[in-house]
Amino acid sequence: MAFYDREIKRVCESCPRLLILMINSVFSKHHSEDAEIIFLDKEQNIDSGENTTYMDMFLEIESCRYHIEYQLLEGNMAIRMVEYGMKETIRGLRQNGDITRVSDGRYEIEIIMPLQAVVFLAGANKEDTITVNLHLPDGKMVTYDLPCLSASETVSELSRKKMYLLIPFQQVQLYSRMLKAKHYTERTKLKLAEALYHFKLDAKKELDNLHENGILNANEVELLVTSLHNIEDNLLNNDDLIREKVTEMGDEDYIALSDRLIQQGIEQGIKQGIK
């Protein structure tokens, strides 16, 4: 399951402009599309549980800090979000020296939590937010909401929300079913093969449309299509028959511009190598 951890981080780091667009959309920010992104913590935190993988991403854009969790399956992330957010905040304070300061004879500590969000890659979380109620020792309670995003939405909906980075991951909603694929009948396997094929087809059509309308550049499309194929290949590792059927379907019905861009890049690289 660490595959999805590596893949989402690869895509985010390779397409910084698209990551900024998603963050601007989720948090109603207005960061410049070419702003520098500082990845503060690239360590992987993977839960030891059998069915869940958690993926941390701490970053800073124009002095604003963000914490994004990419979760493979559905689950309650509230406790982990508070834990990770607080842990990273305290770690940053300690790196900058003493975490306390004296003001009018009183010791104070200022804790600024990063803006946080959860992205569900396979599970379709039914709520738009996770509410956190933090009860303090003095009886006060602080309530705040964490935005929840789902890669299982339609590609057009992901585009509307400017979550272009998640388009290749839409097919991950078949993750749980693909894990059990070897136990399915041939008829069910054929349906899964068709579902995977149509996820790929719809994604490529959407990416082509975004490129033709000047929303995505050629390099971004190429990176997202590469991710699309990487994820499909990983899902197909669970059953040879489904892989065979998806391969047979091919792309004959639709020659995607995104595939041509990849081929053009290869050919251009060969030409440059010859020179």
Features from the language model and the residues they span:
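Intrinsic-disorder/low-complexity detector
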Residues: 2, 240-275
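Conserved single-residue anchors adjacent to enzymatic active/cofactor-binding motifs
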Residues: 1-239
